[in-house]
Structures are given as C-alpha cells and as structure tokens.
Amino acid sequence: MKVTLIAILTCAAVLVLHTTAAEELEAESQLMEVGMPDTELAAVDEERHFECSVSCEIEKEGNKDCKKKKCKGGWKCKFNMCVKV
C-alpha cells in the first residue's frame, strides 16, 4: 500500500515536471520566432530548475538507502535541484 502511494505520487510529480518543461519549450520557440537575442534565451535557460527526484527500487537489497536520480542532458544536481550547466 505504502509503495503504491509513493509510486503514484512520483508519477504525478514527473507528469507535472514534464508539462512545465513542454510549456517552457513552447514559450522559447515563440520567443525565437519573434527574433529574441540568444543572450536573453540563455537567461531563460538559467532560470529553469527542476527538483531532483529520488528513485527507489521497489525491491531493495538489504538496508541500502535510496539514491538520488542523477540529472542528465546538460543539467547538474545542486541543493536538491537540477540546474542547467
């Protein structure tokens, strides 16, 4: 029961993060159509922060702690947030 609740909450959080990222990409594409300078687009990238999610395997081996999911694709984890590098 507890694992199911955690899985549902994790999926909901991932869905919200992906929706937010899609909206930002759409906004960036509209900004590029208007002819926004690259320096302003870089500022938009710097403001993008996503919470680092904690990934736990359902079947743990012994008493090992859950490990934080690593940020990928030009992002690094800092203060429990994924920050654009």
UniProtKB/Swiss-Prot annotation:
GO terms for cellular component: extracellular region; host cell postsynaptic membrane. It is found in: Secreted. It comes from the Eukaryota. Residues 23-48 form a propeptide. InterPro entries: Hwtx-2-like (IPR012625). GO terms for molecular function: toxin activity. Residues 1-22 form the signal peptide. Its main location: secreted. Expressed by the venom gland. Keywords: Disulfide bond, Neurotoxin, Postsynaptic neurotoxin, Secreted, Signal, Toxin. The keyword Ubl conjugation does not apply. Belongs to the neurotoxin 12 (Hwtx-2) family. 02 (Hwtx-2) subfamily. Postsynaptic neurotoxin. This is U4-theraphotoxin-Hhn1o. The lineage of its organism: Eukaryota, Metazoa, Ecdysozoa, Arthropoda, Chelicerata.
